[in-house]
Amino acid sequence: TDDDMGNSEVGHNALGCDQIYSQGAKLVGESIESGALYESKTWKSLISNCKENEKALHFLGLLSDGNVHSNISHLIAMLQKARAEDVKRVYCHILLDGRDVPATSALEYVDQLETVLAELSDSAHEYKIASGGGRMVITMDRYEANWPMVEKGWRTHVQGEGRQFASAKEAIETYRAENPGMIDQDLLPFVVAHDGKPVAKIANGDSVILFNFRGDRAQEISLAFDRKEFTHFDRPGYTGVHFAGMLEYDGDLKIPEHYLVEPPVIKNTLTEVLCKAGVHEYAISETQKYGHVTYFWNGNRSGKVDENLEVYEEIPSDVIPFE
């Protein structure tokens, strides 16, 4: 729309189905505005876990209003609702953008978030930023191109490992001073700490919400939280959390198991029509766009419609920084 930035994922959805659906930011925004998100079984379960078991609530995601992967307004709305429902301890693990928004705009969003967190905090309620880092350095890998990047995020958010700062603002300003020209997406991981101890680590039994709505860069960290059987990196001491994504990021693979907003069901995609007609289809791309010509093209579904009619070929991308 005129208000929201488009992207190649939404474009491939549209090309692959030739239909109009509410998705991503609009879908989530409608759910928040109507209150449907807060009436969902998943939201209620996450909140009741915090209150009944005295657990913390954690929000993890991209902190910006780029409206491509996430929107800070969604995070703020959920923070305010959590406070209204008397959740005592709430922590934000923020990924810095600089890609879908101006390259060095992180402090604008951090300041906005810190203002809200201060308003929600009092002697009985602790609402704080706990950790973070650049989106192209930790947590938000896609298409299994760089699992060590996800592991860095895990160690930062869950284990509280990494360079410590008194605040997210101090971390950003320090990294910029030490690395002239570095943009937000490339900022190194940081842990907010007081007296040498992390403000909050994601602990076993806590409630965790991944507030990104786009699926490609949300799936791998979702698997790390969601799956008992997980082999991509070690998760020392981890026995599980109450985890939910903003949306179901992959319907076929059921990633994640729990989510806050029901995704649109995209039917009668071009691939389905071609397969019904017996037409062969060949999809080829390098890794970083492979999901666009398969997953997004096919209506946010993994796998093939017809193994006998479709051929997918992935050309591995080089693992290099995105500028």
Locations of the language-model features?
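Long, well-ordered, tryptophan-enriched scaffold segments
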Residues: 101, 105-197, 201-203, 209, ...
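Short acidic, Gly/Ser-rich segments with clustered Asp/Glu that frequently serve as metal-coordination loops
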Residues: 67, 216-217
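Short hydrophobic-aromatic micro-motifs
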Residues: 15, 210-211
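Active-site nucleophile/metal-coordination loop of metallo-enzymes that catalyze phosphate/sulfate
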Residues: 1-137, 148, 152, 230, ...
